[in-house]
A protein has these predicted regions:
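Short helix-boundary/capping micro-motifs
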Residues: 15-29
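A short LG(V/I)-centered, amphipathic sequence patch enriched
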Residues: 43-60, 65
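The N-cap/first-turn positions of alpha helices
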Residues: 5-11, 32, 64, 71
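Core residues of bacterial helix-turn-helix
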Residues: 27-28, 39, 46, 67
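Short, intrinsically disordered or compositionally biased N-terminal tails of bacterial proteins
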Residues: 1-3
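DNA major-groove recognition helices of helix-turn-helix
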Residues: 12, 41-42
Length: 72
């Protein structure tokens, strides 16, 4: 992963790549609460919801897809 990326953006991309906050945490050597915190901070900074969390499934919102596309 690009070392120049903001840690919150790195976390977002890891969650998208792994499909899981827990797996992203393991990949990044973070705790799951730290991953959740990074995503919450990013959502607050951008004033959008990035993920929908329904019945144990994680999916990107329309706005989240745009953020991910720009981050890559």
């Amino acid at each position: 992963m690009n070392a120049m990326l903001d840690p919150k953006v790195q976390t977002l991309l890891a969650v998208v790549e792994t499909g899981s906050f827990t797996r992203a945490a393991a990949q990044l050597s973070l705790t799951q609460p730290a991953v959740s915190h990074h995503i919450a901070q990013l959502e607050q900074e951008l004033d959008i919801r990035i993920f929908l969390r329904e019945k144990g499934r994680l999916s990107l919102t329309r706005e989240g897809k745009i953020v991910v596309r720009c981050a890559r």
